[in-house]
């Protein structure tokens, strides 16, 4: 009796069509972005504020990685995507310190979780949990690339935007937070889609990356909803508009934003060598973008203000923000 091979993305298809890949994508979304999983990651915040502990990866047998584990996707395209991902992941120190600076005036505990603690002279005296987890990604992607390509690679580190304070810390954090959420969302979508085109140890590496990104996405998304309760619907609409910018149909956005979110999304896709992908692969990733966004919207619609408060509030937040300090009404369109 025929027994289909099963991996982390469901039934394995070595020559998949769009509909078979779609089934694997849907299966992975249910496994890694279920309501319970997202809720657990958000509810983990209070404990992580008190005693931050990095998520442990499973044991990976790197010697078991081989090119045949990439399925339904040309190896050179897969490798170009991995190279783009590791180049994007590489400047993690810059990412964490910039986010810490935006968070410190508003939520010191979240700032510490993200970027650790820094002395007056700029010396880092404690690494943030986010950096501890994310700094594993570039070495893992580099090793994955080298095992599949049988050649070494040196990351071409991208330039991260530096901290720029304007007039209102809440508005500054909101604009920066959009970049952060879009980046985490994009990474989660990419790694989940790549899981649908891999199996074996190669897929296991991608699943560890995905779990980290989903963890961070849930925390940043939930924190953003708590700090900016009027911004959730605008975020969904904005993410949809960014997906629109990479559709084959010519599109010129009329949206103006000082954060320049459009360039964030398009630059990310350019680094991933998007222009060389087949129409099928583009369609699969766009499908992944939309379905994960749908899942995040459904999950976030269930989060009450009381629940968000229980996950995100800390005494130092209220010490930093008097009741007289009115948050600006967030407008990004």
Annotate the PLM regions.
Residues 1-333:
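Non-heme di-metal
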């Amino acid at each position: 009796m025929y027994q289909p091979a099963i991996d982390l993305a469901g039934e394995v298809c070595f020559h998949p069509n769009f509909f078979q890949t779609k089934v694997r994508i849907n299966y992975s979304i249910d496994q890694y972005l279920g309501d319970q999983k997202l809720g657990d990651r958000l509810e983990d915040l209070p404990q992580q504020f008190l005693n931050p502990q990095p998520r442990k990866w499973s044991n990976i047998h790197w010697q078991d990685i081989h090119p045949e584990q990439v399925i339904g996707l040309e190896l050179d395209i897969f490798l170009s995507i991995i190279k783009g991902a590791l180049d994007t992941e590489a400047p993690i120190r810059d990412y964490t310190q910039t986010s810490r600076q935006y968070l410190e005036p508003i939520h010191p505990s979240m700032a510490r979780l993200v970027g650790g603690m820094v002395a007056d002279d700029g010396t880092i005296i404690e690494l943030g949990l986010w950096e501890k987890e994310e700094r594993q990604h570039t070495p893992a992607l580099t090793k994955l690339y080298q095992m599949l390509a049988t050649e070494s690679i040196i990351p071409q580190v991208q330039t991260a935007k530096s901290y720029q304070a304007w007039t209102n810390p809440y508005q500054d954090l909101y604009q920066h937070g959009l970049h952060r959420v879009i980046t985490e969302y994009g990474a989660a979508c990419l790694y989940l889609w790549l899981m649908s085109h891999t199996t074996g140890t190669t897929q296991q590496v991608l699943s560890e990356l995905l779990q980290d990104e989903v963890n961070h996405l849930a925390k940043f998304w939930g924190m953003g909803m708590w700090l900016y309760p009027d911004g959730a619907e605008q975020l969904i609409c904005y993410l949809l508009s960014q997906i629109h910018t990479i559709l084959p149909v010519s599109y010129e956005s009329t949206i103006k934003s000082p954060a320049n979110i459009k360039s964030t999304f398009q630059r990310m896709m350019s680094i991933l060598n998007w222009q060389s992908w087949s129409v099928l692969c583009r369609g699969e990733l766009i499908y992944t973008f939309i379905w994960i966004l749908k899942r995040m919207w459904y999950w976030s619609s269930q989060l009450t203000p009381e629940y968000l408060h229980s996950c995100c509030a800390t005494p130092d937040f209220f010490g930093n923000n008097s009741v007289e300090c009115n948050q600006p009404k967030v407008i990004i369109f």
